[in-house]
Design a protein with these regions (language model features):
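Compact, glycine-rich, soluble single-domain proteins
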Residues: 1-79
Length: 79
């Protein structure tokens, strides 16, 4: 599942960023493997807006498609 598959209000952990360019861009936002993010908004054919800590980031759809995520442990959707 990728970041662009999530819906508003979802909390997820960044699992993997395989593309080195995307990883470098995400690190600039303070987002890396293991980071917990909350989806604030998913704009149709536009960016995914996420919150990490007190910061909000608009991540373009192409970048969001390159970021693999999982739901946190204990989330029923992991079953």
């Amino acid at each position: 599942m990728t970041l662009s598959d999530l819906k508003r209000g979802d909390v997820a952990l960044i699992q993997c960023i395989t593309n080195d360019v995307v990883r470098a861009q995400a690190i600039r936002f303070g987002i890396s493997e293991g980071s917990e993010i909350t989806v604030e908004e998913v704009l149709r054919a536009g960016p995914v807006i996420v919150q990490r800590g007190n910061m909000h980031y608009a991540i373009g759809r192409n970048l969001a498609n390159e970021i693999s995520v999982v739901y946190p442990l204990g989330d029923a959707r992991n079953a």
